[in-house]
């Protein structure tokens, strides 16, 4: 931590000159754009500054003053993490939110498609009459398209208004709580408009159009007869008479509603993915800190400004630099290139002088395997490098490439005695602080995960509760569709003397069994879906790497949440069953 204090001139004179450092900031007369141009400009400036200081020091020495000046640190903008990290961090947040956004849109489109399909089933007689009266299929398609598309458009407009007004401060404060940011000006963002408004409307339009076109292909006569399928009626499955009557009745309900239960399963699958995605990140960040600890190279990783020797036992020299990735499918990543000693005590892997090993994160994120070529480039020049991967090394703290120190020196044309720092498990006390650029410890390695927890904390709560709400709504809507499609059968059972509780035991119990089965079966599928989403989308839209890890407790929570949600929904459906009149059984009877 840094503390700033004011002192009088007289008080400042009492401060030892050994502890005084003069800091200066500079700004280019002409704007420099791009890291490569900034590197060239900053090197020119440093060279000129060095010449000026050298000339000044010469004059001091000639005047008998030995307190000469030197440059102890130099930090241009393009290497300043305090300036660049916030933008990079927001970029990964954006990728996460966009993935969540598209999952939600798919869920909503699915709900509208199911609702529209159910509406067509209920109004089949009316549609058949209209078709027989001369109305074209395209006219009916337009009629049923209006509501879902109009609702989506209104919701998108209202969402944009809320995003730029009432909710603006909330999301701004998420980042103000994490970073020391300057004041901001709200600007309309075309990309955000496309992602949150145009894309959802297109998805909604296409999904509903496909459903309607498929449903309305039937002839008017079939609509009038309520025969809403081209498939021939299947023969009834024979059930053993040894089974109790209520069990056979319940099984018959399940067999008759297989298409509805498949729709319910698909809905639970999508909603389950939404819930797990919204609750997985907090434990994932904690688990990430644990795997970083386990794969940490050493307790203290010294990075030096200039070479300095140490007599400490156990200290091991290494080389390090960074290169950029070239694959245009992904955002540009900084890859740490380590040159390590032969038979290293800290990096326990056997590497030959003509090969390289990559961290497991590189393998997973870029979909690489042994024998593949990994292309990298110098971010400040046109020089490119091609490395053939000989294997992987478990190192989760960063995206890294490991090679022998000799190979590093040959590859980057360094002196034979060149090194960048030391790996060690204890502090080095015989190296002057002026030679030390930084010391990387476990606390430094997990700063990223801690920062993610702070910056994403409030956002994750929003995703979590929103995901749960969507789960409940989807469960309610889909189970409601099943009751409505069986309204005539339920009405008939009432005429036969069944009570509301008994009917609920038949229809709701059958659906409850299918809900539990769907929740359990969906667990491995949701896991595979999210893993695919990480590798195919999230990794391409963010810098850095965080492994895909989902605790089992997240899936257990999904199943329990689904059961609890359905228990609430079942009560509501029991009320709905009680309101179905017996007269429904007399309607639409062939």
Name what the model sees in each region.
Residues 89-128, 146-163, 194-206, 257-282, ...:
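Hydrophobic alpha-helical transmembrane segments of multi-pass inner-membrane transport and secretion
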Residues 1, 5-109, 118, 177, ...:
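Membrane transport/envelope proteins' first extracytoplasmic loop
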Residues 245-365, 369-372, 376-384:
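Juxtamembrane segments of multi-pass membrane proteins
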Residues 136-137, 219, 369, 499, ...:
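Short coil/turn motifs that cap or connect alpha-helices
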Residues 232-248:
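Short, membrane-interfacial amphipathic segments enriched in basic
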Residues 216-234, 575-590:
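Short cytosolic juxtamembrane segments of multi-pass membrane proteins
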Residues 159-194, 516-584:
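Short helix-loop junctions at transmembrane helix boundaries
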């Amino acid at each position: 931590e840094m503390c700033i204090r004011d002192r009088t001139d007289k008080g400042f004179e009492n401060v030892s000159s050994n502890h005084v450092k003069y800091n200066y900031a500079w700004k280019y007369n002409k704007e420099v754009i791009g890291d490569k141009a900034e590197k060239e400009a900053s090197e020119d400036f440093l060279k000129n500054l060095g010449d000026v200081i050298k000339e000044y020091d010469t004059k001091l020495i000639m005047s008998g003053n030995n307190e000469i000046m030197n440059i102890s640190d130099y930090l241009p903008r393009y290497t300043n993490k305090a300036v660049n990290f916030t933008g990079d961090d927001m970029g990964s947040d954006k990728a996460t939110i966009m993935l969540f956004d598209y999952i939600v849109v798919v869920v909503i489109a699915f709900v509208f498609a199911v609702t529209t399909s159910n509406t067509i089933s209920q109004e089949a007689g009316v549609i058949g009459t209209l078709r027989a009266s001369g109305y074209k299929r395209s006219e009916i398609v337009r009629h049923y398209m209006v509501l879902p598309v109009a609702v989506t458009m209104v919701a998108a407009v209202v969402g944009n208004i809320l995003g730029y007004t009432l909710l603006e401060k909330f999301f701004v404060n998420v980042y103000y709580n994490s970073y020391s940011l300057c004041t901001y000006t709200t600007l309309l963002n075309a990309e955000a408009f496309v992602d949150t408004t145009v894309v959802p409307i297109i998805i909604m339009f296409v999904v509903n159009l496909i459903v309607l076109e498929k449903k309305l292909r039937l002839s008017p006569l079939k609509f009038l007869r309520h025969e809403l399928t081209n498939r021939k009626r299947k023969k009834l499955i024979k059930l053993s008479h040894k089974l109790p009557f209520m069990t056979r009745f319940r099984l018959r309900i399940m067999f008759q509603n297989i298409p509805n239960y498949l729709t319910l399963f698909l809905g639970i699958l999508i909603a389950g993915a939404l819930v797990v995605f919204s609750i997985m990140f907090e434990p994932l960040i904690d688990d990430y800190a644990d795997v970083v600890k386990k794969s940490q190279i050493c307790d203290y990783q010294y990075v030096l400004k200039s070479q300095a020797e140490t007599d400490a036992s156990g200290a091991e020299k290494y080389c390090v630099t960074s290169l950029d990735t070239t694959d245009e499918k992904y955002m540009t990543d900084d890859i740490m290139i380590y040159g390590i000693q032969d038979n290293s005590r800290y990096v326990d892997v056997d590497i030959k002088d003509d090969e390289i090993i990559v961290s497991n994160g590189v393998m997973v994120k870029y979909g690489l395997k042994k024998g593949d070529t990994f292309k990298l480039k110098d971010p400040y020049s046109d020089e490119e490098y091609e490395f053939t991967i000989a294997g992987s090394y478990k190192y989760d703290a960063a995206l890294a490439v490991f090679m022998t120190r000799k190979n590093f020196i040959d590859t980057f044309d360094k002196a034979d005695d060149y090194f960048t720092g030391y790996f060690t498990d204890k502090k080095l006390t015989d190296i002057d602080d002026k030679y030390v650029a930084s010391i990387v410890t476990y606390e430094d390695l997990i700063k990223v995960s801690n920062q993610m927890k702070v910056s994403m904390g409030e956002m994750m709560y929003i995703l979590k509760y929103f995901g749960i709400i969507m789960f409940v709504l989807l469960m309610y809507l889909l189970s409601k569709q099943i009751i409505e499609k069986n309204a005539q059968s339920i009405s008939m059972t009432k005429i036969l003397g069944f009570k509301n509780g008994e009917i609920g035991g038949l229809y709701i119990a059958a659906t409850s069994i299918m809900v539990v089965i769907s929740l359990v079966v969906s667990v491995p599928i949701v896991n595979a879906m999210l893993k695919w989403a990480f590798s195919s989308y999230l990794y391409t839209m963010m810098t850095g790497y965080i492994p895909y890890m989902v605790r089992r407790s997240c899936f257990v929570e999904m199943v329990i949440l689904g059961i609890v949600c359905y228990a609430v929904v079942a009560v509501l459906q029991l009320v709905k069953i009680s309101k179905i009149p017996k007269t429904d059984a007399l309607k639409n009877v062939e």
